[in-house]
Every structure is written in structure tokens, then in C-alpha cells.
Amino acid sequence: MKAWLAAQWQCEQQNQAYVLASIVALQGSSPRGVGSKILVTKDKQFDSIGGGHLEYKAIAQAREMLLQGGQTEIIDYPLGASLGQCCGGRVTLMFEVFSVAKMSVVVFGAG
């Protein structure tokens, strides 16, 4: 089982908010492929989207979203000198915020 998936299950069981950041698009060279994910809580992270400054920026963005109550966001990162990465490609990340709100189901009008 992927580390992020096990962490997601654990967060859901403990009603802990988290952000799931996923690589949704690539251009050129990058350290990880489309579909790679990292799960970020207020004090931990699970799995990897490639390490380095890209991952550092992604973790910082995710934690800011947790603090501010952000919504799903897509951000494009060039993997060049500005991130201190030599891959030279571009990575597009989707950040999905999962809060601790419990969902309930109400059924009515069944007859």
C-alpha cells in the first residue's frame, strides 16, 4: 500500500485535516511522474513528489492551505534555477484540502 494512502485512511479515522498534492501534468524532465502524490498534515508528510525544493514548496503551500482553510488549487512549478532543481521541466500540482467535517446522510421520501 502506498504511504499516502495508508496515511489518508489514518487521517480519516482520526478526523485529522490534510492536503493531498498530486502531480497532474508534466512538461519535460521531472523527478516523479504523473499520479505521484504527497499527503501533508499540519506536522507530517507521507510519500513524495520528487524531493528537493519542489517538495519543500509543495509542503509549505499545503500547510498554508490547512491554516487558511483553502480550497482545491492547481499550481504550475518550473523546475529550474528558481527552485534550485536542474530537471528543466515543469510540474503541475493539484492541492486538495480534506477537512475534519463529518458527513452525514439523510434519507427521506422513501415511500
Report the location of each language-model feature.
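Segments forming oxygen-rich coordination pockets for charged ligands
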Residues: 1-111
